Amino acid sequence: MYTSETTAEIIHDLILINNDRIDGYTRALGNLKDGSDQDLRSLFEDYIQQTTQFNHELNPFAVINGEETTEGKPISGKLHRFWLDLKASLSGHDRKSILEECERGEDASKKAYEKAIQESPDLPIHIVSIIRNHAQKQKAAHDHVRNLRDAAL
């Protein structure tokens, strides 16, 4: 059964994984070598901007009893563990290693969105539509990062 608490919990988890995705790509940017990998710099900046937009679209629905749930303790901490691991593991690796870690993070994001979609049958259709739209864009990002990783030397 749909409740505003259910919606806020699902949205909160997505916002957390999105925040970690932003942090992961920010760290990945910092680990790229100066003067090289301009394509990755541009791509990672685009994904940071994309994810910021995702959160902007989700934030209005992350409310329980008039209070935003976007700050504080995660409702489901396991959802964003992979991005946290990514942030810890990036330390000046080469292009392929950075892409491998980014793909691992994208896997975590993909799982979080899949879980949200599975839990969403009772959610309002406009919220489900937003979640599905994000999931499609996130999957495209995942696949692109995977393809770049596979092509890296």
What feature does the model see in each segment?
Residues 10-32, 80-126, 130:
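Acidic/histidine-rich alpha-helical segments that form the ligand environment
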Residues 19, 48, 52, 66-69, ...:
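Residues at alpha-helix boundaries and short interhelical turns
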Residues 1-9, 36, 60-66, 88-96:
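Short, charged, low-complexity loops and linkers
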Residues 6-16, 36-56, 98-102, 126-137:
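Alpha-helical scaffold segments that form or flank carboxylate-/histidine-based iron centers
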Residues 38-76, 145-148:
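Conserved alpha-helical segments that form or flank metal/cofactor-binding pockets of metalloenzymes
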Residues 5, 30, 49, 63, ...:
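Small-residue-biased structural context
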